[in-house]
Structures are given as structure tokens and as C-alpha cells.
């Protein structure tokens, strides 16, 4: 039997009594965001709304986005990436588990020097895919053109954020390229592996 979303006590400033809120709402108050599912319009809009709210609440405090996602819709992922660049506070990205496809794209969108992978995390990049092959020929051609434009956009972002040459990114996106946390660091998708941060403290 599912237990639902866990609830935790939370006391608002000035209040004597704590109220029970779901754990995600409590963590949002600490500026901790979670992408733990396929990227779709609904989760993208939730994350964007939370980032904009937290940006308005305090522009001086960083946000932290924890990612464990197999990817998802390209435009939804790009919208989350754009919102991360739009808000004033730095957005730290932390990969735990898997950041694949749009998950890795969002991971690389964190503030440079503040992108982290946990030691056993996996990262995967590949090209955007289309799911509309059963339409009219003209529609398929327009769809293919749009997919190529999206691929070009994604490639440019990876080039900018990783420092890798466009030819290498383009070549690697031809297939599913899986990386360990250390390989993702060497590739420039993340800046640190969590064990590295532990060893310096």
C-alpha cells in the first residue's frame, strides 16, 4: 500500500505551533528542488514556478537542484534550463542516480563551478528524438527540420557549458553516450564529484 508523500513538521516564523507539510514543500523552503522523474510540461512548470518564486523571495540565496531523471520532453527541458539562466541566484545542480538526455542537459545548466555528481551517478547524452513518423510526408519533413534546429540549440549549449568542441559534441550525440561521474567531470558536464568535495573538508 503506498504511503503517499511523507509529511514533516514546519514552523513558520512567529508561529508557536508547527504545521505538518509534505516533505517537498518543506525542502522548497530551504531552496532545495528535485527533478526525480521524466521531464514533462507539468514538472517543468512546477520547477520554473518554484525558481521564480524563490528568486523573488531572496535573490542573494543560491538554489540547489537534485537530479535523478531519465530525460523527457525536449522543449520542457529547455524551458527549465532557460529559467535556471534567468533567475538571479546561482543554481547548483547535483546528479544522483541518473541524469540522461534532458536530465543531463539540465544538469549542465547549473552555475559553472557548482555542478556536482555523486560518486556512483551516471550521465548520458544523445540527440533529441522525434515521435511523429506516421503523419503526412510534409509534416514529417517539417518535424525533421525542427528536430535539427533543436539539436543545433542543444549542441551549442553543451559546447558553451562544457568547453568541448562542437564536432565532438555533435559526434557523441549521434548515439547514447553513458558516463561515470568522473567521466562527466572530465567531459565538463559537472565540475566536481561529491567524493572530491568530501576529501577537501
Swiss-Prot record:
Catalyses: Hydrolysis of proteins to small peptides in the presence of ATP and magnesium. alpha-casein is the usual test substrate. In the absence of ATP, only oligopeptides shorter than five residues are hydrolyzed (such as succinyl-Leu-Tyr-|-NHMec, and Leu-Tyr-Leu-|-Tyr-Trp, in which cleavage of the -Tyr-|-Leu- and -Tyr-|-Trp bonds also occurs)
Q: Name one GO cellular component term.
A: chloroplast stroma
Show the PROSITE patterns listed in the entry.
Answer: CLP_PROTEASE_HIS (PS00382), CLP_PROTEASE_SER (PS00381)
Q: What is its EC number?
A: 3.4.21.92
Keyword list, A-Z: Chloroplast, Hydrolase, Plastid, Protease, Serine protease
Gene Ontology BP term (one): protein quality control for misfolded or incompletely synthesized proteins
Q: Show the GO MF annotations.
A: ATP-dependent peptidase activity; ATPase binding; serine-type endopeptidase activity
The record ties this protein, via Gene3D superfamilies, to:
2-enoyl-CoA Hydratase, Chain A, domain 1 (3.90.226.10)
What positions constitute the catalytic site? 101 (nucleophile), 126
Q: Does the keyword Chloroplast apply?
A: yes
> Where does the record place it?
Plastid, Chloroplast stroma
Outline the subunit composition.
Answer: Component of the chloroplastic Clp protease core complex.
What protein family is recorded? Belongs to the peptidase S14 family.
Sum up the protein's function in the record's words: Cleaves peptides in various proteins in a process that requires ATP hydrolysis. Has a chymotrypsin-like activity. Plays a major role in the degradation of misfolded proteins.
Q: What is this protein called?
A: ATP-dependent Clp protease proteolytic subunit
**Where does this protein come from, organism-wise?**
Staurastrum punctulatum
Amino acid at each position: 500500500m503506498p504511503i503517499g508523500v511523507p509529511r514533516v513538521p514546519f514552523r513558520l516564523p512567529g508561529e508557536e505551533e508547527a504545521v505538518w507539510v509534505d516533505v517537498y514543500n518543506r525542502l522548497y523552503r530551504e531552496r532545495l528542488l528535485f527533478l526525480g522523474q521524466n521531464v514533462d510540461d507539468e514538472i517543468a512548470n512546477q520547477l520554473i514556478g518554484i525558481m521564480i518564486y524563490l528568486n523573488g523571495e531572496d535573490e542573494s540565496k543560491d538554489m540547489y537542484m537534485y537530479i535523478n531523471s531519465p530525460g523527457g520532453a525536449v522543449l520542457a527541458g529547455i524551458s527549465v534550463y532557460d529559467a535556471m539562466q534567468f533567475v538571479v541566484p546561482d543554481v547548483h545542480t547535483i546528479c544522483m542516480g541518473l541524469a540522461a538526455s534532458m536530465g543531463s542537459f539540465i544538469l549542465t545548466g547549473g552555475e559553472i563551478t557548482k555542478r556536482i555528481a555523486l560518486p556512483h551517478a551516471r550521465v548520458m547524452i544523445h540527440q533529441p528524438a522525434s515521435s511523429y513518423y506516421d503523419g503526412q510526408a510534409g509534416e514529417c519533413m517539417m518535424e525533421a527540420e525542427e528536430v535539427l534546429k533543436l539539436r543545433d540549440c542543444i549542441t551549442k549549449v553543451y559546447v558553451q557549458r562544457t568547453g568541448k568542441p562542437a564536432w565532438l559534441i555533435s559526434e557523441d550525440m549521434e548515439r547514447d553516450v553513458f558516463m561515470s561521474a568522473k567521466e562527466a567531470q572530465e567531459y565538463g558536464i559537472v565540475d566536481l564529484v561529491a567524493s572530491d568535495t568530501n576529501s577537501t573538508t
